[in-house]
Amino acid sequence: IDPYGNLKYQHYDNSPAYTADYTDEMKDRLQKDLSSYKNFELFAITDTDFMNIYHHYSPYCFVHFDGPHMTRDVLTEAVWFANRAGTNCRFVFDDYPKYNMPLIQSALEPFGFKKLEAGKNKICLEKRRNNL
């Protein structure tokens, strides 16, 4: 899920809105690079539009969160997907030190998510069977 198109928005909790380099050319390159993955599908829309349009889709088994990087937006997305996550679903969060990951982890605990692994810039949470 990524609209691309050089949109101006607030990228981080403590930064003003600005335009980054997420161009349509980058989108084209991504689609070409991932074209051999038959199950890959890019939704070139905002996360809010995706959640409004595809609210009936579930269950999800894997979600990679790679933007936005504001705590409130990541939290909104994480809870939305957690409500639709199947058992053993994994959530991978990119650049997690840039937002309030402890808050997000805490919010996901009632859904059964526990930390599986954490590195310098990525963290993986997994939904355990029966919230164990």
PLM region spans:
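S-adenosylmethionine/decaboxylated-SAM
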Residues: 1-132
